[in-house]
Amino acid sequence: VMQKYNLLSVVRRKKFKYVSEHLHKYPNLLNREFEAERPNQKWVTDISYIKTAQGFLYLSIIRDLYDNSIVAYKMDKEQSIKLVLDTIKAAKRKEKITAEVQLHSDQGFQYTSQAYFNLTQSYGITPSMSRRGNPYDNALAENFFSILKTECIHRVKLSGYDEARLIISEYINFYNNYRIQ
């Protein structure tokens, strides 16, 4: 019958979920307990994007829950695993990391990668991860980005990457050293 009327059937193809190296999941050890008794006990990390006239600049941060300071940050034009690893390495150079440091993240591909697993293990960092689709589990990392964008980024039109890097670096210095928490 279909041939007689030149009709074609629509065949839906099965969609495959591709699995690459992004396979590590960690328990939610932080469990929304956003207070720490001492520095370098609980850290939260995340990535956000900053819009510039040249394109997006990605900002990766690590925030200490003891005093809400930004322990380390890195920026890049790409949202990559390398950006996250470089941020952790910067934190390692700056702070004394003990085996008790808990680093909490969302379930982004950077944080489930083999490279992230290897680096956190080599530094003695205990990874913790938000539940899937639950941004409140990593609220204090998200909160910093909200503060940054409200107090700094949305007040100016960024002409390019260099200007964004400068403004963000100056703001983080202000945030850590002068802003009342």
Segments the model singles out, each with a brief description of its role:
Residues 1-181:
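Charged DNA-binding/catalytic regions of mobile-element recombinases
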